[in-house]
């Protein structure tokens, strides 16, 4: 299984080595809303998401190893067509101008990387759109196009 994350911004946002906006914080606390009870990759009861930009990993704060996922940042142009409509709809609802939007693809443990290191369009399964605002102090994580893992996480940065 692979989930995808890409990066885009209204302005010029500097990037971390993994392609995420430099305003991304390492830990967010908040609340999780799921339209299903089938959270595939993360614990449905989570109130935390942690990012490690040096390892390109995201976790739900449970410290369960299977809930620590490696991701790859993709550009919006690299998204599979079935994800682009929902991504555009979500971007259209953004009111704050201090916003960075990016997408991540989760890489399964059994996946052999492509020669160019990119997740191909055919390998995209779950895609997560991440919206940062307030200089990265606020976050919204939305799943795109995966009927088994529909959720939204809203949170604020914590040290």
Identify the meaning behind each predicted range.
Residues 33-39, 57-132:
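Contiguous, well-ordered beta-strand patches that form the walls/edges
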Residues 20-27, 48-57, 130-139, 157-159:
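Short, solvent-exposed coil/turn segments at beta-strand boundaries
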Residues 9-12:
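Bacterial signal peptide processing site
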Residues 14-41:
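Tryptophan-anchored aromatic micro-motifs
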Residues 120, 129-152:
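Short, exposed beta-strand-loop hairpins at the edges of beta-sheets
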Residues 4-7:
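C-terminal motif of bacterial Sec signal peptides marking the signal peptidase cleavage site
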Residues 32, 55, 60-62, 143-145, ...:
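A mature extracytoplasmic/lumenal domain signature
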């Amino acid at each position: 299984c692979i989930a995808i994350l890409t990066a885009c911004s209204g302005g010029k946002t500097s990037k971390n080595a993994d392609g995420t906006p430099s305003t991304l914080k390492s830990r967010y606390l908040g609340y999780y809303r799921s339209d299903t009870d089938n959270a595939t990759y993360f614990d449905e009861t989570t109130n935390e998401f942690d990012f490690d930009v040096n390892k390109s990993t995201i976790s739900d704060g449970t410290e369960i190893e299977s809930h620590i996922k490696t991701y790859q940042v993709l550009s919006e142009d690299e998204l599979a067509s079935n994800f682009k409509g929902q991504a555009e709809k979500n971007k259209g609802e953004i009111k704050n101008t201090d916003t960075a939007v990016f997408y991540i693809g989760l890489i399964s443990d059994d996946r052999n990387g492509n020669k160019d290191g990119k997740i191909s369009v055919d390998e995209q399964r779950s895609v997560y759109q991440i919206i940062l605002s307030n200089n990265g102090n606020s976050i919204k994580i939305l799943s795109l196009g995966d009927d088994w893992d529909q959720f939204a996480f809203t949170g604020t940065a914590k040290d």
